[in-house]
From Swiss-Prot:
Highest taxon above the source species: Bacteria
Protein name: Succinyl-diaminopimelate desuccinylase
Reaction(s) catalysed (UniProt annotation): N-succinyl-(2S,6S)-2,6-diaminopimelate + H2O = (2S,6S)-2,6-diaminopimelate + succinate
Required co-factors: Zn(2+); Co(2+)
Primary gene name: dapE
Cofactor details (free text): Binds 2 Zn(2+) or Co(2+) ions per subunit.
Subunit structure, as described in the record: Homodimer.
UniProtKB keywords: Amino-acid biosynthesis, Cobalt, Diaminopimelate biosynthesis, Hydrolase, Lysine biosynthesis, Metal-binding, Zinc
Residues at the active site: D76, E141
Length: 395
């Protein structure tokens, strides 16, 4: 029996599955075959929710006596866009000059392929693992993330599963393999402000109520002053206005409504609840500011709607997990990785409620881009890092 020890072969098999979210595309089936060659038992639960597509997931475990390590990730990928723009077809896994091209090469089928190869090499060299390893893999990370990791974790917990540590194989390195381990993530909170006015002729503003003046005032209150200056482990919280809409194409008509959406990435100065309270307080004060409203005395009429569920800030403190992975990266690459909390959210935000979690994978320079690609040397390097980590983690 040949074990899946070659990360490039593993990745090619996964890339050739067109698993554009929410489609499974054969990717979980291909992964399940690899894992069963190593003696893993596997389950493929499907989760549903209102107004979202049904999503297939995979949970596989190889049990032993000792700690339980979870590898987590996703096989769904973003659309490739116009395939004519690609140097090689996005689902062909073509190799040119030591580089493999394909959608998901780094985000994050490459990480999965390397961890599979690392486990296979460990088994080939040492036989049984001194503990348990599980793969918790979803097909709903690039989509709404409703029927994926968050439900798969609860499903597994209800069946008696628990974990001592987890690695998420997202592409964490900005420039080169070994640059960065993610040990936490900022929180994320989104909302929409709607200001109601009175439509009218632009030449007769006294007969109308321009909501644009109100939305500008409210948005300004969220942009300044800064929410904080950052903390020891996190950069400063940052709010970005992502849309401003009035639904009005006429230049001589005052609109009757204006909306603005925003997203804020926040640090451990705040909880989602305390940040919501701060935003509400700022808006309430700003609603009484009539400097842009031509002397009107009534407060700005507005509504605030919170969008989706917030992602909570977290920081992992597990010394064994972080120390073992750091030493493994340094041993293979010769450099000590930065421990970082930068970047966006990931499914680690769900896992942190079940066990300590870190993120480490390939280099993310081409993720979501045309000609997404990975150097075969990086696949081998990441596999060696994972293999060393597995050996040291289980002692």
């Amino acid at each position: 029996m040949t074990l899946p020890v070659n990360p490039a072969d593993n990745l090619a098999a996964l890339i050739r599955c067109p698993s554009v979210t929410p489609a499974e595309g054969g990717a979980l089936t291909a992964l399940e075959k690899m894992l069963k060659l190593m003696g893993f038992s596997a389950n493929r639960p499907v989760f549903s929710d209102d107004n979202t597509p049904d999503i297939e997931n995979l949970y596989a475990r190889k049990s032993g006596n000792g700690p339980h390590l979870m590898f987590a990730g996703h096989t769904d990928v973003v659309p490739p866009g116009d395939e004519k723009d690609w140097k090689h077809p996005p689902f062909a896994a073509a190799i040119e000059d030591g580089v493999m091209y394909g959608r998901g090469a780094v985000d994050m089928k490459g990480g999965i392929a390397c961890f599979v190869a690392a486990v296979a090499r460990h088994i080939e060299k040492h036989g049984n693992i001194k503990g348990s390893i599980s793969f918790l893999i979803t097909g709903d990370e690039e989509g709404p993330a409703v029927n994926g990791t968050v439900k798969l974790l609860e499903w597994a917990k209800q069946r008696g599963e628990s974990w001592d540590a987890s690695i998420v194989g997202e592409p964490t390195n900005p420039n080169a393999l070994g640059d960065m381990i993610k040990i936490g993530r900022r929180g994320s909170l989104s909302g929409t402000i709607t200001v109601h006015g009175v439509q009218g002729h632009a030449a007769y503003p006294h007969l109308a109520e321009n909501p644009v003046r109100g939305i500008v005032t409210l948005v300004d209150s969220l942009l300044y002053p800064a929410f904080d200056e950052g903390t020891a482990n996190f950069q400063a919280s940052n709010l970005e206005v992502t849309t401003i809409d009035v639904g009005n194409k006429a230049t001589n008509v005052i609109p009757n409504k204006a909306t603005a959406s925003f997203n804020i990435r926040f640090n451990d100065t705040w909880t989602a609840e305390s940040l919501q309270a701060e935003i509400i307080s700022r808006l309430e004060r700003a609603a009484r500011d009539n400097r842009l409203r031509q002397g009107r005395e009534t407060p700005i009429k507005y509504e605030l709607t919170w969008r989706e569920r917030p992602s909570h800030v977290f920081l992992t403190h597990d010394e064994k997990l972080i120390g073992t992975l750091t030493a493994s990266v340094e041993a293979v690459t010769g450099k000590r990785p930065e421990l970082s909390t930068s970047g966006g959210t990931s499914d680690a935000r769900f896992i942190k409620d079940y066990c300590p979690v870190v993120e480490f994978g390939l280099t993310g320079q081409t993720m979501h881009m045309v000609d997404e690609r990975v150097a075969l040397a990086d696949l081998e390097g990441l596999t060696q890092i994972y293999e060393r980590f597995i050996a040291d983690f289980f002692g």
